[in-house]
């Protein structure tokens, strides 16, 4: 049961009432307002506060910024058929007018605006349980900090706004360091208060927990090379003793794995409420439009766990490759996936709107058996933080601090030895440099298409890995009979002096006279 439906119409109605405009209204509101609701009347009860905080959750990362964000890195390709600005980012052709980055910027700042409204008004409520109101306050503070973490990771320098603004107010850009310090301070205050519970009952699944605050602190710390903070926060999550790896890697991203003990924080979709097309990002043969395509960069990250077969490059690969990617020869629905140029199926590589361009298709997040009768009713939650990530952050922090001990190997090997994965363990005796490479590769193998690859490449200063010829699937060329790698001559660029920080959107520059554009971009 999943009752925190963060995209339902009532949530957006709250936003429309108090921020001057609606972000879009779904059908089927929980209430029918009979007239305008005054601010004085609204901030009266505990239920008012809960609805307002629910509105803050509404701006959490969705399928776009979880699945699609990996499509602008070395491991993926975001189809240009309906949102060409995503592909522009992938190719290194980014500018302040890019619609993709503008949309992400606006969503995070909507969340911040809503959180600021909660924090400015919640103390006015007299009719409510003090403990519940304190928890709701902590939730709003956490979500605001989460949005600022994302903004600082993508744009680096952004305005820090902590109170409701008048329409004419303008705020200058704050440095990335100021934003990061604010986020860590906020998370520390929330963690130290112990207001957030370790878990919730079924009526409140999806709300922020104490563990989520600790895990988010580890994430913001490791993104900014604060390895001692990251180590300690990750260890604190581990020591809670309430999280564990879900046995089925593939099942974790399907209906069976929802709300499992591996999930620390996610964007919830409610049964009978807000949904999305569960097949939409995947193959044409099951009704998808190949929105995000895995690329050769991902294939190359997965190890061979048995002899490499020159007659079949897919044989003996890490099982997570099979769980994450549809490639020719794999079952798909009631058929066999075949995207080779000679295929007579809808999945044949093509420049059409629905077919894959480079040959591979996304399998992660696709739950065929559950949604085969109506994929539009997909309600698989978008996992934002999970325990495997915490283990890898712990291991990486210890490696960077040169505190290499058995616990580092244990953390990595727990993931590699997950039932249904069971790839060989990493044996002890590795150097710091060797372990650094191991944990970085393990992150992409484990966390592919969970919206983390771009952040990892940026914090490691490895943006150049996105550079070069875009390469898709292995296939047998009909004329030569040899295995080939598909490409169309598309080349991605990366400017290390500019592209680690996205440009402030042009729309923002046009209305804010005191904001400063990031270096390297012209308006």
Label the model's feature ranges.
Residues 45-54, 58-64, 84-155, 169-178, ...:
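Conserved, well-structured interaction surfaces
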Residues 114, 179, 186, 233, ...:
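Alpha-helical solenoid repeat scaffolds, predominantly canonical TPR units
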